[in-house]
Structures are given as C-alpha cells and as structure tokens.
Amino acid sequence: KLRMSLIPQQELNRIMKRYLDGAEKYGHNNWKKGMPLSVYFDSAQRHLQAWWQNDQDEDHAAAVVWNILCAMWTENNKSDQDDRHEYTTK
C-alpha cells in the first residue's frame, strides 16, 4: 500500500501551489494537454539553476518538481510528446 504520510506535507503544498497557479492562469488541468518532454526538461533545468543561485523571485525548487511530475505524466500518457529521440546522439 502507498503511504502518503511519508511525503512531507509542507513541500507537497508548495508543488500543489504550482498546479493551482497554473489552473488560475491557464485553466483547470490545462497542463494535461501536454507539451514535448524537452519543454519540461528545459524549464526544470532553468529553475534548478535559479534555485542553485538562490534566486528568490519564485519557488524554483517547487517548479523543478512540477516540471518533472508533468514530464513523468506526459511520458506515461502522451507518448506522441516524447521528443527525447531528437536530442540523443549516437
């Protein structure tokens, strides 16, 4: 059984705020329309760098997690948005 009590609630709330802000700005579950995985990857990388540089203009750590969660959902539900093959080298 999954034990949701193991997830730290305060940090989970920070991620949930990202979803709520998006719903207010773009509409309920708009993120489920999907975007190429590269868009989530690029955004996560930008937010990770901003977090690492201690940029305080938004919750960059939560944005990193939000992007990864959306990428995971896209990977499982929108295989047509998986553009990783376009960026791999042989």
Please provide the spans of the model-predicted regions.
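Intrinsically disordered, low-complexity regulatory regions
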Residues: K1-K90
